[in-house]
Structure formats: C-alpha cells, structure tokens
C-alpha cells in the first residue's frame, strides 16, 4: 500500500484525520461526511507508514454489518492482514471463550431469549397488572449498561427520571430474581459478557497481558453511543495506553434512554491528554435543501452544522392530513408518484417515530400494491406484546370479548410504547370488524396476517419501513417522514431538557437519511386504541416551514404590517420592558407545561414581538417564528402582554 495514494480523493479535513500522527485522535464526523472511508483509510495509512501492525488492531463497531463493511473496505485498500473487527459483545465473547478454553473452564450458556426468561421470574401480582416482561427487560438492560446493581436501581432510576410502568423497588426485585435465576442455571446474558471480560482483564493478569499484547491499536466507531459498561471494558483493554481513535457525532447521540453517555465523546481530550480533534462537516449524502432543513432542527449553539457538496434538489415538502389513515394513503401515493421508470422501490423509505405507527402505513402500502419491508423489528406483529396478544386470542370467546380484552390490555399499558403498539392492534381489530359480517378471533388473526404481511417480492426490491432509531446509519434517495406531531416528535414522555434535546437530535438523524428528496407529514387527528385525538404539528415544523419558504424564495420577505394597522406613535416603555415581560410570561407557561422555555417560543421570536409591538393576530403572523398554530394558541396572551407593558 502507498500511504500517499491513500490520501487521494479526500478533502482537507479528511486528510488531516487520516494522516494525523497523534496516537489519540477524536474524529467528529457529521452525518454523511464519509466517516467509514476516513476510519478505514486511517487504519490502512498507519499500516502503510509503519505506525501500526494490522494484526494488533481492534476495531469496535456497533453492528455486525458495520464490522463486515469495515473489513471489506480494508481488503479493498490492499491490507493483507485481517484486523479484529466486531461489536463489543462479539469481541468480548471471543476473548472469554479463549480464556475458558485455556483454563479448562466449562463455558456458561448464553441466554438469547431474555424476555421469556424474565417472564418466568415475574411475580403473578405483576402480570395481573398488565406489566409485560419487556418493560422489565428494558430497565434491566438500562441498569446493566449504566453499571447499576439491583439494590441501587431505584435511586439510579429516580435520578435519571426513568419512566416505568411499575414501582421502582418491584423492578429491583425482579432484576435480582433474574440475576439469581441466571446464576442458578449457569447462564449469562450479552451484557454479562462485557462485565465478565472487564472483570477478567482486571483480575487475571495472564489473560490481561495476552489481550493487551494482541490489541495495541484501538479504533471505536459511533463513540457517542458508548455506555458506561462498554467504556469500562475499553478502559480495561487500554490499561494505561492511549493509542485510540474514536469516531462520533454529538448531534447523532440518540441512545441516552438506553444507557449511552455522549460525555465520553465530549471529554475525550481530557481523558487522553495530547489528543487531537478533527471535525468532518462536509456532507456527501444530502442535497443543500435537505441539509438546510436538518441544520435548522439542531439547537442553536450545538455546532456541527453540515456543509453541502451535492447539487441542488427539490425543496422538502411539509404536508398536513386530515387523520392518520389519510396520512398513510397520501404517503403511499407519494411513493408511487416518486417511483419513476428505472428507479427501484428500495430507493424510498418511510420513517416513523414509533412501531405503533407502522400498521396503517403497512395497510396503505398493501392496498396500493407497493412492495414493502419492515426493517428489523419495525413491523407491528414483530413486537413482543403484540405477538403475545395475538397468541392469546381465541379460546372459544366471542369477538366482542376479544375487543374488550384488547381494550383492557391497552388501557393497562398506559402512555408507553407498549400501550401504543397494543392500541394499534386494537384499531386493526375494529378495522377487521368493519369488513367481516361474522367477525371471529380466528378470522381476525387470518386477516391481520394477510393485511400486514410483506409482499411476495418484499425480500428483494421493496420500500423500507423503519423507525427513526433503526434508520441510523442508513440512507435512501427519497425519504418520507410520518407523524411529525406533538406527542410523537418529540415523544410525549420526553419532558426534561435532556430528553427533548435527544428528540431533536433524533429528528435530525431521520432527516439526514435523505439524499435527494424529503417529504414530512403530520395528521390533524390520530387514533390511539379506541381514542381519536386531535393533534398539533411538531414544535419543529415551524422552523422547518420557515426554512422551506426561504429555500423556495431566497429573496422573499414577509410583508410589513399595513401602515393602517400600525400602533399610533407616542410614549411607551423601552423595548426591553416588553421583552422582559414576554420572557416572564413564557417562563410561566413553560413551568405549567413542564417543558423548557424554548419549546414555547425561541428568544428570537419574542425579540421580534417586542420590537414590532403587534396589536392583531395578522400582525403576529407577519413575524418570524409565528405560524397559525402558535398564534391560535398563544396569540391573545401575547397581545395582552404587549398591550400591558408596551405603553
């Protein structure tokens, strides 16, 4: 391999990242900035220049697919020796198996069906309350990722504002039962593999020496998603060494709810004195118009705004629909309209915030004979609580009993993802009843399977149906976002500043999956179980609407208020007095709604109101950051504040 040849075709920042002589390197790689290309070329460049031996490289990725892609790219670059690449769990398991073999230790059984195992240790009193094993498993996984023991779980969960369907001490009790049952059966789960590997690196000096001799140069991808358990294992591998390169993007940190801690990326230079940081901000994926929308979603001051390199494309669209069913049908029509001759169905994807949204969209795609594929476990029928509910149907009961049971399950699950999924199933149960004169549980199962089944050719060319989280790392020429409403984007249970910031980043991730065209949709009404609820557009859509209007007419300006409607001149308070009053009003509204102040209005919007001193709703609508939804909701109060404090 030629080191200089490996720098060809890279931009200046990428060259710095690939050729940096620093042993400790942090690469802040924005969406679509070519991070995998840079990571593989850095490994290959260091090998070509003699600063590392590929046989002693450990490259950690977050998926098996990413590990495979990294290995293939290194081979294509001419690297003769294969590097060790894999997920934390895969690498830890390989190391442990070697140790167990060398020490003649009988390996424990690795538990691969955690939900079923937890279900067997759940007290009957919990299952009667409609709490599923899946709810408990999520908390156990969060606790283990954060290095929290069962006894410490209640305090840790309270400190982290965890939303749990049952009381925290009961979760801790089930957590302890789960750990005891595993010990009794000599079983370990995937998180235990990391814990055991870290323990053995700390306690077994011979094992640690062998591991540290083998792994001398560390590369970690998606470092913003590392959790404390993974970070502690990385520390154990490194010991007192600092030959480590991490790649991450703070604007794509979307897994704090699952235990991830982006502070490891933020604090990398403090952890590794002398480390260098290179920022990659040139985006090679999305059109300038899509990036403008993505950048407007980020928090002001967050940094990391992306710079476009691709040609211009169409301005993203924002569409309102009467209800969620109309939204699903409109998305299906939009997909068919975008399916030009010679294009593939797989060039398009529908992204949703929650699994429960997929049912109506699957039905609409099915009715439109559009092949689709629910990636991973995105399909409603793949959700454990839905599978269990479907299995429980029948038993000679009437269909009315079936509906009643589903309604009871949905109500018991409350405002959770599980409740939303069961609510989607209940809605489908009512849909089935409207098409079958003699509905039965067995008939519903057959209809459900047919309605939500993948098309025959879905394994090949098919539209992808993916959640925002599952879409990370993927891209499509055309992306349709569904359900951009308050309560979904951001999700209803995101109430802290940190949770709302993560929801903002999640929308940013979803938007930056699009290469050429982006369509954003929301419904004015949405059905949850048996409840039909009015909806309001996501708080982010006002900024997006404003950005799209500017993109459509770069020279456009909102017309000033008509001179006939301007306030008469005369003595009045200084503008700051009005602004102070507006901010005080906003603070009170934010306290009552239990949200950060910027969710009500940005500072720049209040500054515009204070400067313009509007007297009518029309004058409010002429100001930046004020659309019809917010004027209808807050307009009268804004005008009262201005009238009271404006002199």
Regions from the PLM with identified roles:
Residues 54-139, 144-148, 152, 369, ...:
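Conserved P-loop NTPase-based nucleic-acid remodeling module centered on helicase motor cores
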Residues 3, 8-19, 23-28, 38, ...:
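Conserved helicase NTPase motor core
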Residues 568-615:
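C-terminal accessory/binding modules appended to enzymatic or scaffolding proteins
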